[in-house]
């Protein structure tokens, strides 16, 4: 997957907390707001174990194709343990595969003759590989931001970020700069639209991902770019053309785990018949309303408000446990402002839990100096 060594949460854990399983419950105490990946993984697995979910899941199965026939979904799939191809019928299908696993790789002039290394952020694993290297990072979203900071933190000689449309515009630390759009490569030299030239040893493409569902028939596939409200999904979940097909987590995201939970609770109630679908006209009107609101958004604060209101609406439609979405909204906005103040130190801040109200302690070591990302080092020092 796209999770690399030394990856720490780039948003406050208090914004992604599960309403029914707090960080305090899992760790037995409040922990700092920006944990590394091992800590978050442990938290997620703790919730899985509490619910005894593994015994209810069929693993080692690859879906080959999904078609809708005679009011049923016909799935062909491979049982990898026994190397058998099987076919079964199902009443509902929930697609919750995520959309950050199939890289989008653009072409640049001179790319094929570049003598250095070119990789997508999906394949980025260890920033220490690039110690004393001149690194070019292409992109202007969260992956570009974090990969660039990681390379700088672990000793890259230089880090140059090339953006296509809008610069991130942060106050980058020494050794980092942001320039406008890669025009071409000439040997080991990267030449940008604004005339900047930079020697390059490695180019990391933080250019996004594709929504990719090869296991679904064409007529069932969601086709969209990464956006806060994909079209054809009623309440961001139910496939407009077939209400027995549901998608979870297909949005661009500020909210994550608790939004996915609200979607899952809503999907459960649709499947169980507790939530009835309105008329086709009402569904179209509701989708159009949300898409129109999304298209007017101009800045992160507005985007946070938009997704918070969406998640609150879903929350109101099921019995998902109580959680303070207004505090989450405030936490997100404060986090964005911390990044503007200092992109290098925003992870050293503290936030309050929307589940327990507890205030996170400040981490014992500033992020920019914390080279050990193990759970033991994070929790026990």
Regions found by a protein language model. Give the residues of each.
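Flavin (primarily FAD) cofactor-binding/catalytic cores of flavoenzymes
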Residues: 1-6, 27-283, 295-381
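Conserved N-terminal glycine-rich FAD pyrophosphate-binding loop of Rossmann-like flavoproteins
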Residues: 1-22
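Post-kinase regulatory C-tail/linker adjacent to protein kinase catalytic domains
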Residues: 282-290
